[in-house]
């Protein structure tokens, strides 16, 4: 099953919100110092494949940022955030894997947040 940021079906939307919050929190806690020091910004679109038990089954760059370091960082942060929550039974009955496609935005909003951030859209 493939889902994106536009998913509104409730069982998927709740899982997506939980997944996004976890990845974003872990990404911000582990924001790489080299990215912070160089004040790099950009966006990369990743497809993350989550198995029924929440295991990370795969990561694919759908649209690179144009900066290898940001692409590699997004992949590294997705790996750090895994394993994810198991798929809810209602989803797990329909599929063995969930393909989540999201945009990872690396921002430099020091004046607003006190530190560079990663935002998952």
Predicted regions and their residues:
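A short acidic/small-residue loop/turn micro-motif
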Residues: 63-69
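Short, small/polar residue-rich loop motifs at catalytic or cofactor-binding pockets
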Residues: 39-45
